[in-house]
Amino acid sequence: MFLRNSVLRTAPVLRRGITTLTPVSTKLAPPAAASYSQAMKANNFVYVSGQIPYTPDNKPVQGSISEKAEQVFQNVKNILAESNSSLDNIVKVNVFLADMKNFAEFNSVYAKHFHTHKPARSCVGVASLPLNVDLEMEVIAVEKN
């Protein structure tokens, strides 16, 4: 809490310009694996938590990085649809790979989904990921107008 113009205010006022924070949840993507939301909407921005290659019924996808990446994209699409957004509205993508040897194969799937619209992206090799998966992807998007 702090004083502003001699009126006691609570912390949410510090979120200048952000008037609404809304958690997003859909049964068309796997449930959160810990204490977090599948996504959060802040005004017209959608922040999608890292999606891993699990099906909506919470089963791990077996197979190639391509197959796993397709499931991750489907999860992201479903969460964005629930948020009034889509892949075409993505501003930034963060990709985490447990083995950078999978980069080319992952990138071929990525390119299929982003052929004309190319959001900013980072791809990072990491030592490990939750539930021992080899791929995780998080995105920031805007809502459709």
From Swiss-Prot:
GO process terms (BP)? isoleucine biosynthetic process; mitochondrial translation
Give the CC-aspect GO terms.
Answer: cytosol; mitochondrial matrix; mitochondrion
Record keyword Transit peptide present: yes
Q: Which UniProt keywords apply?
A: Mitochondrion, Transit peptide
Taxonomically, the superkingdom here is: Eukaryota
Q: Which GO terms describe its molecular function?
A: deaminase activity
Q: Pfam families attached here?
A: Ribonuc_L-PSP
The compartments listed are: Mitochondrion matrix
What InterPro entries does this protein map onto? RidA, RidA_CS, RutC-like_sf, YjgF/YER057c/UK114
Question: Transit peptide extent?
Answer: 1-17
What other note does the entry give for this protein? Present with 168000 molecules/cell in log phase SD medium.
Its biological purpose:
Plays a role in the maintenance of mitochondrial DNA.
Instruction: Give the family from UniProt.
Output: Belongs to the RutC family.
Q: What is this protein called?
A: Protein MMF1, mitochondrial
**What is the native source organism of this protein?**
Saccharomyces cerevisiae (strain ATCC 204508 / S288c)
